[in-house]
Amino acid sequence: MTVFRAACVQLRSSDDVHENIRAALDLVRLARSLGADFVATPENTTLMAPDGGAKLERSFEEKDDPALPAFCSIAEELRIWLLVGSLAIKVSADKTANRSFLIDPKGRISARYDKIHLFDVDLPSGERYRESNTVVGGDVATVVDLPWAKLGLSVCYDLRFPQLYRDLAKAGASVFTVPSAFTETTGRAHWHVLLRARAIENGAFVIAPAQGGPHKNGRRTYGHSLIVSPWGEIIAEGSTEPCAIVADIDPNLSAEARARVPSLQHDRAILIR
């Protein structure tokens, strides 16, 4: 299988959709200039609102979202595969979907994925999140054929549910994408170890573009976009600033890792009495 170059675009998005689109497009171009064939942006690419209600007010139905034509156009112009980590897509009067879009080099939407696991937590820092108040969770996992490998899609909080990734791996995925907006608190504690664990458990590459730094709405996200090898090695990492990081992805390394430690073959259903 052919080696390809993947990029994570790290953003510090605000509640200004058009400003965020421009910032994302600039970094997608930078990623392509670094040789990327596949570029991924983070969760909430075009909208980091102060709360779910504000995000709902600023969201669009898919057919009206100004980001999609812009991202489809740049994918075609640069001849890249582009994963738009997620957009807030209005699906009813009071709900959005947290939806990823995979766009092919002809500017066509190749796949969609709605984040399954919603972030409803109370953190020791006092931060409180109730994503389910304004977001409808998805119920379908997605695996897509790229020219180089099968890609398994996920978003942010999905990372804490290892069975999703095992199911994606069993469906043939050897590369996982995890576009995220981890909080500074949870990111510092868990980001690196969770991404490395998902890679090691499944012998898969993990491509995890992140939101990073202090946002205009007061929220602080962790940044540190990562690309992790199937052996759990960090092969590219961002800081907390907007940036693009790249790494070469050799799908043969996934097969080698799975041959060394064949846990996918050894995985068994267990009956608990």
Place the predicted regions along the sequence by residue.
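Cys-nucleophile CN-hydrolase/nitrilase-fold catalytic domain and related Cys-dependent amidase chemistry
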Residues: 17, 25-106, 112, 183-201
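Residue-level structural signal for beta-strand termini and adjacent loop
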Residues: 54, 60, 114-115, 156-157, ...
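Short polar catalytic/cofactor-binding loops
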Residues: 10-15
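Active-site catalytic loop in hydrolytic enzyme cores
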Residues: 91-171, 184-188, 193, 259-263
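Extreme N-terminal starter segment of soluble prokaryotic enzymes
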Residues: 1-7
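Short beta-strand scaffold segments in enzyme catalytic cores
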Residues: 84-86, 99-102, 142-144, 225-227, ...
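CN hydrolase (nitrilase-like) catalytic-core segments centered on the catalytic cysteine
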Residues: 63-83, 150, 156-245
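A conserved C-terminal secondary-structure "cap"
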Residues: 252-273
